[in-house]
Amino acid sequence: MPLINTSLPNLIQGVSQQPDATRFSGQCDEQVNFMSSVVDGLTKRNGTRFVRRLGAADLTLSGDSFIHFINRSETERYVMMHNGTKLYAYNVLSGDEATIDGTYGGYTAAGTYLDVSSSTESARDTLRATTVADGTFLINRSSTVSVDNTARSPSLDKEALIFVKQGDYEKEYSLDINYSSKTPASAQINLTYTRSDYFTYSLTSASPVSVVGGGGSGYVNGDEYKVVTYPASHTYNNVTYSVDVGEGEDTSVTVAANANGTIATTDTSLANIGRIIGFRGPGGRYLHDVGYTVTLTVTLEKSPGLGGTTKYDNEALVKVYSENSTQAFHADTSRISELIAKGATSPDLDIDPYNHNGASIHSTSANSGLNDRFPNIIAGTNADFTLAREGNLIVLTRGANKSDFKIKAKDGLGGGALGVVYKEVGAITDLPLFAKNGFRVKVRGDGDLTADDYYVEFKTDDENQDIGPGSWVETIAPDTVLNYASASLPLFITNTGLNEFKLEHLRTAPRSVGDETSNPFASFSGQVIQNSVFFKNRLGFVCGSNVILSEAGLGRENTEGLFEYNFGRTTVTTLLDSDPIDISVESDRVTNITAASASQENLILFAENGQFVLKGEELLTPRTVSVKPITNFKYNNETDPVSIGSHIYYPFDLGNNTGIREFALNKTTDVYESTEITEQVPRYIPKDITYFSGSLSENLLGILSNEDDQSLYMYRYFFSENKKVLSSWFKWEFNMKIRGFEFIDSMLYLIVANATTDISSIVSIPLNFDGEDEGLAAYTVNGGTLTTTLTVSPNDNVTHLDMR
């Protein structure tokens, strides 16, 4: 074999698994615990510095623990850790534990938003965090966001505004008011069968209101409702019978047997109202149990009209008819025992034979009805409405009954002189500028659309004035859910002082305008939030195929002085540039976005099957925003992508190993490109990536795998005039298990665990340490000297020496 003699300019190009013939010069088979540098060449990595053991009771962390670092300032740097049962916070500079809600020893997760016991994933895979200034948003990817159905906007008051728009001589102004009043009264009729003939008893009344049971079909003769059929059933002495119940409007009929249980209809809807009760035996035979009693309970409407007159007068009759197709009436009238009315004595009843085919009705002349037997049917106006007048305005308010009513204005000027506002109007111009403070009304938009309807509330110029001049301001629809359930929202962890954290749920602004159609909740409602991001002064969440960005701004203070984010519109009459953004990706495949990373002026979205870009024009607004697919490369969502400078790095599965892609915008073609940077080491990085971080100042990327948790796989790169001149892979090995790490400036912080006991500690590695560092003891060992004296007392009497 001939001797090959060549020169290598350096040995900084790192590991390559390619054949020797295709490798670049300066690459090697293995590089362990060295650092590649275009300035210093190949140098040994710096040693670790012990900071402190975690926890007074020796905190243990497994590879499933969630770890997140917080870089508040050069003097305050923290790490938050969730080991599956508790959330801890520590200062990585001093090693001191930080309090959470004023308590040391960790925040117990059980029964809270941080409880991951029901998740099929570990705490590491279930939790995600994003830090913005002094606040950290913590996401539980197994928790569904819900709404708070207990907190709703007030129901609409049953009141109307009546105002004179135009006055004229000898013109008539009037109102038609139609309404129901008071509590319905009821009566009972006991009917006793004495023979086997078939009878159907029918019942009529003025205007019943509520429903217990009913249905069927029939016809109306005057004010009397007749039955044809209604099939329902009951069991009487183990025999099934048919019950015929008539049809009417707003009535309540209850049928009960005196012996073996209750006979009742099955349909209680207002559309199927029982008026006539009849019984038929098996095989079409008629009941022949002598002494069998049927009880009918009928509820009647009490409806006084405005001014004291009744809508249905007290002459409304309750009549009982006997129906037989071939015979005249055969009932023993003496056995119809009583009619019991509330607060009234029992009146007489009329018994009329009736031919079911409608050919003839035989009635006596002495039809007697209820005739004042319900003493409270007529009620005074004052009990039903109150009136308040100020100037040309009358406020008509429903009384204690609070039931709905209809009102219509009439005038002698073609309907343009007297105005009425009740529940809704056709246009905002239909509303007076002199009204009751707090009066709310719906303003209809396009008749074919519901999304353009909106609601307004009157505010007097003088807030202490009940009725007066003022203006109409937009408000929320009545009886509308206002906000999300606080306990289902992500956590917001605030750094309130040195080594102090406050934990609370994210506050969201309650819905203040519109309704479920014009201002729906964000699309994360009823869904699981996957991740969070902060982009162009908007807090964002990714959920399914949607990206949701809050109202522009760093949140806002509410009336209580508390900080909150708004995910609803502030007006539904127009679309504002600052309004929240809720947009879905454009893709022909099922897409589940799990991460987002800002890149220059755009937001890059990552799904398992592709990447998307969210962008707007000069301003990001609901009108200018768009989301489009840009690349279709696989992404492993076990860890979030890492943004370093103008590049984004993200992992993907490469068989039983892991590959890394470098995502960037090509400045020449203005096209996004995703380049694999592990082409020379396809079998180097193990799978099951747990943590992924990088340093912009050191052009360094670090990767931790659960399959090799005592090694960090490192990638060092360097660009010169848009050309990458260094692309070096290597690894750093430790005698401790690495649970998490983070690059902050030129320092690498690691959370490590004893390889045997899993007792955890904080250590750090300076990346550009030159051997001289203030605050470190330096001692030169000469000759046979075996001892030295330390000027400090290390915690736990454990000392790590950096030997050089």
Predicted regions: what they are:
Residues T60-T75, S119-V132, A522-F535, V585-Q600, ...:
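Structural signature of eukaryotic scaffold interfaces centered on beta-propeller domains
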Residues G135, K158-K165, G308-S523:
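Long, charge-dense tracts
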Residues A185-V320:
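Conserved, function-critical positions that sit in or immediately flank catalytic
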